[in-house]
Amino acid sequence: GFIAATSGDESATGSSWAPFAPTSDGVDSGARQIAEHVGRQYRLPTGEQIVAVTGGPLELQGLPMKIAVRKSVADGGEIDVLDGKGVLYRMCGLGPDCAIVKGRPTPERALLLRREALELALYSFHDLDDVEHVVVFMPPPKGEKPSVALHFGRDDVAGQLARPLQATLPLPVPNPDTITTAPNTPAVQQLTFAKLFRFSLTQSNQDTSVFLVLDPLPTES
């Protein structure tokens, strides 16, 4: 439903930016509400929800995660350890290892899930307190382990946050059959393609934290 503005600062409310806003700006319950709301919007042509989405702080089994981005040799080959509060979303298709059991794995479906990840990120930066990073674990192909994530920094989407959500992600929400002709899909492709990474987790040897290692995906020639 439509949420009325509760203060003079409209940019901080759900009403002017998007019809939905979580009732909490914390990374626990706020991210959980965003995950539930966004997850229900994305469906197969049959009407079935594609993935279950969970959200919360950037941690693994209670241990905080530090993001370490390994750049390709072409981009300098450095490792950047990123600071700032983060949110972690997980998309699960409810098959083995969270693979999607319904429908066919197509490039269109993958693009639709990237649109969903972008929507999760935009809500998180707009509505949650002091979030600087959003990581979304994507569902794997059948027979594989989850290995692909999207990582967004707040600055990556500053332009989108300054406009209402529907300017970036117009309604109605597309499905795998309609995503390629949906308004603004080229912008979604551009905003998300460079944010795809192969992820791995490794325990830090210095403290009780975990490194979330993000490696660039091999580019298709």
Model-found features: residue ranges?
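Bimodal "functional hotspot" detector
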Residues: 1-115, 141-221
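Residue-level detector of functional hotspots within protein domains
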Residues: 73-75, 117-122, 135
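Long, charged/polar, surface-exposed segments that mediate recognition or autoinhibition
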Residues: 110-127
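A short amphipathic beta-strand at an alpha->beta junction
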Residues: 122-148
